[in-house]
A protein has these predicted regions:
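Conserved, structured core segments of small domains
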Residues: 2-7, 11-145
Length: 145
């Protein structure tokens, strides 16, 4: 039997081609002063909302992964200059907003990724920076690795 005819006999139609999805990293910066100024229990309520929303996005295939980071005072910054390694405590930047976590989002484009990021409550008490993830396979090919 001709395969074309077999598909027609079973009433199979070709699947519509999905738009390519891209990955975006949403870096979540928090302002601890703003969090501490919230009413008692509000930060925990925000976290519950965040986790429920993350579970929904994962189920929809729009969230690849997410993690919360430990407090910035546990961080180390590593630099190598002129062959010497320097390790210092804490983040390098002197800023009120510190990196508190990240979400790896899958979306059709930057606009959709920004919409997804804006649904998280942390944009109200800090900032969520959304950046496209570079295709490492394309980089490998470009540099011959």
């Amino acid at each position: 039997m001709d395969l074309t005819m077999a598909g027609a006999a079973m009433n199979l139609s070709p699947r519509p081609k999905e738009a390519p999805r891209m990955q975006f990293l949403a870096l979540v910066y928090v302002d601890n002063e703003m969090l501490e100024a919230l009413p008692t229990g509000e930060p925990d309520a925000m976290m519950r909302t965040c986790l429920r929303h993350a579970d929904e996005l994962k189920a929809e295939g729009k969230l690849v992964g997410f993690q919360q980071l430990e407090d910035a005072n546990t961080a180390k910054s590593v630099r190598i200059r002129n062959g010497r390694t320097s390790v210092v405590d804490g983040p390098f930047a002197e800023t009120k907003e510190i990196l508190g976590g990240f979400n790896l989002i899958e979306a059709a484009d930057m606009d959709e990724a920004v919409r997804i990021a804006a649904e998280f409550p942390w944009a109200r008490t800090g900032c969520i920076e959304v950046r496209a993830v570079r295709d490492v396979d394309a980089v490998r090919q470009r540099v011959g690795a």
